[in-house]
């Protein structure tokens, strides 16, 4: 508790003491009042960056207490001797045995002592106690491009103000446990790692690296900032220049970023490990948005593992060409697609979870809500620079293994063409194996257009060993992209609901502990996986992807790889 100080009384007492001393020659030799004892058990039970709260044992008869503070002094030289000058100053004269000093400076060490005043006589001071006042949270504003190697330290929060580019061959190192925020006042503030530069962001399960909103918990929305964008030197199937979606507004350093023309699918743009990207997304134009994590022409030398994207305005993960592999991905409540691959992406992804229960509320002015959200949406080639249209090469041909896709309950996606588990279109190829697709009102799989059917026909597009539960249909009817025979390709319909398929799938999750993605006993996902791989899938997997006897993103025998480092929040 903080009590009113009484400096006037302390001054009066000092004057009285001096007067008594001066007149003592005229007294009759009496002993005078006894000196009050020093207060005992002086403690500082509460210390913040701006205050120190002190308590001590009561001294019998005390009218007030004198609290003094000394800033811990450095040794000084006096002649040939080394000594320490100690200067205490009075900071309070409370009437009770507690006092809060609110004039401290963060990052400073202080010594405190207390004396009692009884009947006008000040007693002996207590032995000083040392109190270290913490420096408090450090905030670093990042408002210009990073063109030389730099480290973001875990003891600081970094605020991206505008569109920040790691460029000129620089490497950005980020320590485990570091928080990076997008400036809420500068819409779309983002971090770009451009071609030839690198990011080394290796967190741990106990100390993940978090990219998030500047707003306080409870006030955060999709689109509060832009996102994390990596541009590599990999190959895409469009001829350029091809300007990255969401760039080129030429405001707040948002200049056009061209990602075409790369020729090295083994390029190395660094590391993302145990990283969360929260409440991002920025869409200056319809169908031209920044995502939670955008990977444009990123090569396979880059490491992407244990990454979560949470409540972004647009896609959670989007790959434009390149061949970067990824493992252990979690997408939670996406504003558009959870996993979007296009323009010749040829990487391998294993262990991926997507969960959707609602349409996220977005920040006004940050962009437009999607009209066709899916869990997986893969395209071959589309738009300017596709010289052969949807048949442009190299084909989009990922390997997606051990995926768990959970959609919203019926009626959540009421408009547009969204709401499918997997949409494969515009000439995409790829291998989709050992998966679990649950709770999609329309259908589990939607294969569209004749060029996609050509990929099915030549064996470069395979959907195999996947369980579907609580879906309106296995295949989207009336499409021309082809289908797969469920018996031949082990596409297994389940009689279980989505909730019964897992150990724990809450309707309104509030914390990581609410989820358990482990398949429940009796679920078809506990078995039936393609193991070993064969044919084109074996060739594509190489040493990067392991065949499993189970289906879905989680081994029934463990580990629960998503725990400790992921987060689940509405705002």
Predicted segments — roles?
Residues 66-107, 119-120, 124:
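Recognizes extended acidic, P/S/T-rich segments that occur
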Residues 116-120, 178, 215:
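Surface-exposed loop/turn motifs at beta-strand-loop junctions within extracellular Ig-like
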Residues 136-173, 183-196, 203, 208, ...:
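Extracellular beta-rich repeat passengers
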Residues 47-49, 60, 94, 105-107, ...:
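Surface-exposed coil/turn segments at beta-strand junctions on protein surfaces, enriched
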Residues 1-12:
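Bacterial N-terminal signal peptides that target proteins for export
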Residues 19-22:
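C-terminal motif of bacterial Sec signal peptides marking the signal peptidase cleavage site
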Residues 25-61, 106, 118-135:
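Pro/Thr/Ser/Gly-rich low-complexity, intrinsically disordered linker/stalk tracts
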């Amino acid at each position: 508790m903080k009590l009113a100080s009484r400096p006037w009384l302390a001054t009066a007492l000092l004057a009285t003491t001096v007067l008594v001393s001066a007149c003592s020659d005229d007294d009759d030799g009496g002993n005078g009042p006894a000196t009050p004892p020093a207060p005992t058990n002086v403690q500082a039970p509460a210390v913040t960056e701006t205050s120190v709260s002190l308590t001590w044992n009561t001294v019998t008869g005390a009218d007030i207490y004198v609290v003094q503070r000394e800033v811990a002094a450095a040794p000084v030289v006096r002649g040939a001797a080394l000594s320490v000058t100690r200067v205490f100053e009075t900071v309070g004269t409370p009437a009770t045995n507690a006092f809060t000093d609110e004039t401290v400076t963060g990052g400073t060490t202080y010594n405190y002592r207390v004396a009692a005043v009884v009947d006008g006589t000040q007693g002996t001071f207590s032995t000083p106690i040392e109190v270290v006042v913490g420096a408090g949270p450090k905030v670093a504003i990042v408002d210009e491009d990073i063109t030389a190697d730099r480290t973001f330290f875990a003891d600081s929060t970094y605020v991206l103000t505008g569109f920040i580019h790691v460029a000129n061959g620089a490497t950005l190192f980020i320590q485990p446990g570091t928080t990076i925020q997008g400036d809420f006042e500068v819409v779309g503030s983002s971090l770009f790692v451009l071609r030839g530069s690198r990011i080394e962001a290796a967190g741990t399960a106990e100390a993940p690296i978090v990219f998030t909103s500047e707003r306080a918990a409870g006030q955060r929305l999709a689109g509060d900032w832009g996102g994390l964008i990596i541009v590599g030197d990999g190959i895409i199937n469009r001829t350029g220049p091809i300007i990255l979606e969401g760039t080129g507004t030429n405001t707040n350093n948002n200049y056009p970023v061209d990602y075409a023309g790369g020729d090295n699918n083994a390029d190395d743009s660094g590391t993302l490990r145990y990283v969360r990207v929260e409440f991002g997304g920025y869409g200056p134009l319809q169908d031209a948005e920044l995502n939670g994590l955008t990977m444009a022409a990123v090569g396979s030398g880059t490491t992407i593992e244990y990454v979560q994207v949470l409540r972004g305005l647009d896609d959670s993960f989007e790959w434009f060409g390149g061949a970067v592999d990824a493992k252990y991905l979690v997408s939670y409540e996406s504003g558009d697609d959870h996993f979007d691959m296009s323009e010749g992406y040829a990487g391998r992804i294993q262990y991926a979870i997507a969960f959707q229960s609602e349409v996220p509320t977005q920040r006004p002015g940050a962009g437009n809500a999607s009209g066709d959200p899916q869990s997986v949406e893969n395209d071959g080639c589309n738009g300017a620079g596709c010289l052969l249209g949807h048949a442009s090469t190299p084909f989009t041909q990922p390997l997606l293994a051990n995926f768990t896709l959970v959609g919203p309950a019926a009626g959540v996606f009421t408009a547009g063409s969204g709401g499918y588990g997997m949409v494969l279109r515009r000439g995409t190829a790829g291998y989709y194996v050992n998966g679990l697709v649950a709770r999609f009102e329309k259908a589990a799989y939607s294969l569209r257009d004749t060029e996609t059917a050509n990929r099915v026909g030549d064996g470069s597009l395979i959907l195999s060993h996947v369980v579907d539960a609580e879906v309106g249909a296995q295949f989207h009817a009336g499409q021309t992209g082809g289908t797969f025979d469920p018996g031949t390709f082990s596409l297994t319909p389940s009689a279980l609901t989505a909730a019964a398929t897992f150990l724990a799938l809450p309707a309104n999750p509030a914390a990581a502990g609410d989820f358990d993605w482990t398949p429940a006993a009796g679920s078809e996902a506990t078995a039936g996986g393609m193991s070993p791989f064969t044919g084109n899938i074996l060739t594509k997997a190489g040493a990067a992807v392991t065949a499993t006897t189970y289906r879905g993103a989680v081994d029934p025998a463990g580990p629960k790889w998503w725990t400790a480092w992921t987060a689940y929040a509405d705002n």
